[in-house]
Amino acid sequence: MADTSGVRQEKVTVVSGNEGLKDYSVVAGSFGVKANAEGLKDWLDGQGYHSTIAFNADKAMYRVIVNSFADKTAAAEARDAFKAKYPNRSDFQGAWLLYRVY
C-alpha cells in the first residue's frame, strides 16, 4: 500500500506540456528558473514520460510533473514507482504529491 501522506496543496498554472493536470500530480523537481525546469522536462520526455511544467506564482517555483491522477492512491503508487525506477537519482527520491487547488 502506497503512503498517501505528505500531499502539498498548491495553486498552479500549466506553462509547458499539453497533458491536462488532474487533482493529484507527481512532482519530480522544483525550480526557481524556468530553463532548469525545461531541462528536466526534456530529459523526462526523452525517458518516455509526458511531463508538464506548472508554475506556482505564490512561491515563484516551477514544478516539473511526471504524471497526474484523479485518485490520490494511484498518484502515490506512481510516485513510489518513479522513485524505485531511479534509485541512483537522489534528486528524484524527493518526488512528492501535489494536490491542485483553484
Regions found by a protein language model. Name each.
Residues 2-22, 32-102:
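Extracytoplasmic
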Residues 29:
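Conserved beta3-strand ATP-binding lysine motif
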